[in-house]
Amino acid sequence: MYDTGQEAPRCILVGRKTGREETSSLPELSLLVEELGYIPETILSFPLRTPERKFLFGPGQAEVVAREARMRGIELVVFDEDLTPAQQRNWEHLVKSRVMDRTEVIIEIFSRHARTKQAQLQTEKARLEYLLPRLRGAWSHLDRQRGGARGTRGEGERQIELDRRMILSRLARIRREMEAIERHQTTTRSRRLEAGIPRVSLVGYTNAGKSSLFTRLTGQAVRIQDRPFVTLDTTTRTCLIPGWGRVVVSDTVGFIQHLPHTLVDAFHATLEEVRDAHLLLEVVDLSSPNLLLHLSTTEEVLTEIGAHHIPRIRVYNKADRSSPHPLLPPSDHPEILVSAKTGEGIEGLLSLIVREMERHYPIETLELPYHRLGESHEVLSRAVIIHQEYTDVGLFVRYAPSVPSVHE
């Protein structure tokens, strides 16, 4: 949250009572609304066995929220659940203040952090698709003011139709621009595939320290802040892994619990970098009290985007913040504790990357006398050279044959 010198507006958070604090996403929602500049003054949670059509929650629970909002003079009510357009309108009429659901909060944060043309297009697409079914509530006050005779179209209805056409037209232009960017990215990825260079993608929950680890591995500084969703664009760099050779490392957008499907769809091109990886570094915030929830959410998102089968190393980051270290859950993947901030464990991580690459993409050797050096080009033109040495008798090379795509 930014300090503007003015008192931040206050809000109420409303969510589902889970019975287990570690599975509740309300604390995370509190951090998200703070990122938008609001102060969560009250958090209300209710059991939700059967969703109600009008308010999602029951009428008695709705009255509790409305009474709390009136008593405290609240400017915003935020729901940790997705609301239908009708439910959102009903709540706004009841509490007489702005109402947002979790999806809208996340889309708004994405919009504020989008820096590149692609990220701006992706977030605008998600925002417009979210807004489209909610146009009715935006102009209904015009029809109420004018009354409107039966069988005639009111001013509000005409405005809705005009807005709908404008949004659909804008969405069509956005899709065309995104397709042009994606074609260029596909060409770039194809060239890397042809070069046979292995690709390593950093994935994990938002604010786990992926960008800090990316900087530590590649030596290339990227935008790093202790805030959610600072990274929305995929940043890719080639780096040299001792004992292996060149790899392409990618820093990707962070995951979050209940990641809106509109954003998964809008960012599908960005997430292609994850699906095309040969090895994933699953970065986990070791100091987070919600570590287990972050692990399960990451697994869900990787499954949703079709990347759960890719070889993976679980990297518990921020080891410098966690003492003593918590008891870690069992894992099917190799794991290591590191601190991207201090460098602790990074050498061990590099060794683990080499071990996993060799396990999945075996190393071969080539020995050629000097009079046959011309034959090396055919073998090594698409290989990953790990070690090359000219000896007294000829050329000695350790290499990985052209690393196949994970989809091959």
From Swiss-Prot:
Alphabetical keyword list: Cytoplasm, GTP-binding, Magnesium, Metal-binding, Nucleotide-binding
Ubl conjugation among keywords: no
SUPFAM superfamilies (alphabetical): P-loop containing nucleoside triphosphate hydrolases
Sequence ranges assigned to domain Hflx-type G in this UniProt record: 198-361
Entries under InterPro entries matching the protein: G_HFLX_dom (IPR030394), GTP-bd (IPR006073), GTP-bd_M (IPR032305), GTPase_HflX (IPR016496), GTPase_HflX_N (IPR025121), GTPase_HflX_N_sf (IPR042108), P-loop_NTPase (IPR027417)
Location within or outside the cell: Cytoplasm
Names of required cofactors: Mg(2+)
Binding site for GTP: 204-211, 229-233, 251-254, 317-320, 339-341
Pfam families: GTP-bdg_M, GTP-bdg_N, MMR_HSR1
Residues annotated to bind Mg(2+): S211, T231
GO CC term (a single one): cytoplasm
Highest taxon of source: Bacteria
Function, in words: GTPase that associates with the 50S ribosomal subunit and may have a role during protein synthesis or ribosome biogenesis.
Similarity comment: Belongs to the TRAFAC class OBG-HflX-like GTPase superfamily. HflX GTPase family.
Stated name of the protein: GTPase HflX
Native source species: Spirochaeta thermophila (strain ATCC 49972 / DSM 6192 / RI 19.B1)
